[in-house]
Amino acid sequence: MANVTGYTKAGVDKLVAPLFSSISPFTVGGHYYSPVTYFWPDFYNEGQAGKVSKWAKTLAYGNALGYVIMNRSTGDWSAKDNDFLTQAQRAAAAGAKRILWYIPTRYGVASLAKDDAARNGVPDPDKFTREYIMQLCANLRSQYDGLFQGVFLDEVINGWGAQAGRVGWYGDLIGEIRRTYGKNFTIAINPGSNITEAVCALDFDVCMSFENTAAKYLTDDPNSPIANDVMRALPSTKWWHVIHGVTRENFRQVIDRAASFGVSHLYVTDGELVEGEGGQWVPEKNPYQNPPSDWIMERVLAWNGGYLGLAERVAALEAKAAPSPQPGA
């Protein structure tokens, strides 16, 4: 058939593609399962007898997935790794809405004087300069091209106390990333706690503003609220809560608590953190070493789909209708 409109398909695609790429996959008020996927690519274990693929178990969440994180040796992006390329491709195909790539920032201590107390105990305090972080971003774009959809900046300041002096350094870093990669590139930050108004004003897309235990999540602390008034005024898609040490008994309380904060991105796991002598840098038990137990998946999918209450009622009815065990059975 002749082209009567004067437009070719290639021409239309070129015009329309930028419009679709600028549409966020996240809806304010929506629920997204955004796991902390620090484990190594293991797609080659999928379907192998006697082997388990942690990534396959994670990607089984399908369209419920929000963000996933690629983390090679705590941010070593000096060379292309085809295992990470393949795993990122599989994550995108499974339904992950954005692929983030891990880069630590060491709380910006590289910007401080050599004798500043904030540098004490921080590994490689001089390494993660703004220039070095930008070079890692450039490496990632060169190595993984369109799969480099965003960056997960770990070990970010919350802006309180003496950290206030480093907000400008983060503003410069985030601003340079934004100018280089554009408005559709995702910038995630992880202070792991509530943040000041000055940090809220930075040009990030999502902030992991809670990363701690279920016990702490379910406790009100007026001296350290999980979300302050400035944070609560921002869209739900800005916030990502990670809760470990979750149990069958407190799962629903955790979910209800997240709803009270207006959080779109959630990761709950029954994995536990035990810092031990290694502290936060080398913990004895890491809650992200493995995906959550299977019982969490069914509940998370119900939460994501908006039918958690119904699923719980059905489960309660099934339990009530189940025959009681007979003596001697």
Tell me the role of every PLM-derived stretch.
Residues 6, 11, 15-22, 307-325:
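Amphipathic alpha-helical oligomerization/assembly segments
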Residues 17-310:
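Glycan-processing catalytic domains of CAZymes
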